[in-house]
UniProtKB/Swiss-Prot annotation:
Protein function: Specifically methylates the pseudouridine at position 1915 (m3Psi1915) in 23S rRNA.
Gene that encodes the chain: rlmH
E.C. no: 2.1.1.177
Residues annotated for S-adenosyl-L-methionine binding in this entry: L76, G108, F127, S128, P129, M130, T131, F132
InterPro entries noted in UniProt: Alpha/beta_knot_MTases, RlmH-like, tRNA_m1G_MTases_N
Protein name: Ribosomal RNA large subunit methyltransferase H
HAMAP family: 23SrRNA_methyltr_H
UniProt lineage: Bacteria, Bacillati, Bacillota, Clostridia, Peptostreptococcales
Keywords noted in UniProt: Cytoplasm, Methyltransferase, rRNA processing, S-adenosyl-L-methionine, Transferase
TM regions (residue ranges): none
Family the UniProt entry places it in: Belongs to the RNA methyltransferase RlmH family.
The organism of origin for this protein: Alkaliphilus oremlandii (strain OhILAs)
Enzyme class: transferase
């Protein structure tokens, strides 16, 4: 399985980088992993909705350029479907069985994802109705992918 994580923003926090590096190392036993970071656009506090759309569209263009033909795209979105770890494992396994071995997970910037990215998504996944920093979300996503792949292999995991 080939998994690509496309996220907006460069990771700056050392403690998150350490956790992400750990899960990247663990995941190499189960999948080929590629992480792509798209530069985030400057977004001052008081943007109008039109200015927010411009920022999301610019970030979205960068995301869409990195989605290859044939990739199954899972966008992280507050309006997406919430799954348990076991259900995510089932989803990943069913994608592999259906011949979708190239999966891209998309993490938007602080303003979310553009409409074009959401339209391109084959599936929308929500981890929680709460909002998380997108850098932290990358770590959470990697942990859940790792957990899901261990579930698929029938290996023990912490419940």
């Amino acid at each position: 399985m080939n998994i690509t994580i496309i996220s907006v923003g460069k990771l700056k926090e050392k403690y998150l980088k350490l956790g992400i590096d750990e899960y990247i190392k663990r995941l190499t036993r189960y999948a080929k992993l590629n992480i792509i970071e798209i530069p985030d656009e400057k977004a001052p506090e008081n943007l109008s909705s039109a200015e927010e759309q411009i920022v999301k569209n610019k970030e979205g263009e960068g995301i869409l350029k990195n989605i290859k033909d044939g990739m199954y795209v899972i966008a992280l979105d507050l309006k997406g479907k919430m799954l348990s770890s076991e259900e995510l494992a089932d989803k990943l396994q069913s994608l592999g069985v259906a011949g979708n071995s190239n999966i891209a997970f998309i993490i938007g910037g602080s303003l979310g994802l553009s409409e074009d990215v959401l339209k391109r998504a084959d599936y929308k996944l929500c981890f929680s109705p709460m909002t998380f920093p997108h850098q932290l979300m990358k770590l959470i996503l990697l942990e859940q992918i790792y957990r899901g792949l261990r579930i698929i292999k029938g290996e023990p995991y912490h419940k």
